[in-house]
Amino acid sequence: MIQMQSRLSVADNSGARELQCIKVLGGSHRRYAGIGDVIKVSVKDAMPRGRVKKGDVYNALIVRTKKGVRRRDGSVLRFDGNAAVLLNSKLEPIGTRVFGPVARELRSEKFMKIISLAPEVL
């Protein structure tokens, strides 16, 4: 459950360390975003020689949330923190690696690249 001003960690090797949500995409009055949703983020902390700089604005795909996601069988998949993968304007991942597990809910036509890069799909 990510909303404006939420801070997220980064789950790829794009060079960013911390992100801040500045807009939840998908409707003018949409308040929350969950796993599999695309948000607009600002880079708040970056590595010195990374691909991205502090202050840059990107799209990001949420891959882990503390709130979790409810499955059809009634189980709930929760993670220890909120994490996202940075995307370019064509919704392709900026990084070449994804760290940590990701949810199976990302398995759509648009985000199969992130599923294939992830070490574990839950």
From Swiss-Prot:
Record keywords: Protein biosynthesis included? no
Q: Name one GO cellular component term.
A: cytosolic large ribosomal subunit
Would the keyword Disulfide bond turn up in this protein's UniProt record?
A: no
Classification via CDD domains: Ribosomal_uL14 (cd00337)
Q: Which Pfam families match?
A: Ribosomal_L14 (PF00238)
Query: In its UniProt record, which GO terms are filed under biological process?
Result: translation
Keyword annotations of the record: Ribonucleoprotein, Ribosomal protein, RNA-binding, rRNA-binding
From what superkingdom does this record's organism come?
Bacteria
GO MF, any single term = large ribosomal subunit rRNA binding
List the HAMAP family.
Ribosomal_uL14
Q: How does it assemble?
A: Part of the 50S ribosomal subunit. Forms a cluster with proteins L3 and L19. In the 70S ribosome, L14 and L19 interact and together make contacts with the 16S rRNA in bridges B5 and B8.
Concerning NCBIfam families, the annotation shows: rplN_bact
Q: Which family does it belong to?
A: Belongs to the universal ribosomal protein uL14 family.
Q: What does this protein do?
A: Binds to 23S rRNA. Forms part of two intersubunit bridges in the 70S ribosome.
Q: Which PANTHER family match?
A: 50S/60S RIBOSOMAL PROTEIN L14/L23 (PTHR11761), LARGE RIBOSOMAL SUBUNIT PROTEIN UL14M (PTHR11761:SF3)
* Protein name in the entry: Large ribosomal subunit protein uL14
Originating organism: Dichelobacter nodosus (strain VCS1703A)
Q: Which gene encodes it?
A: rplN
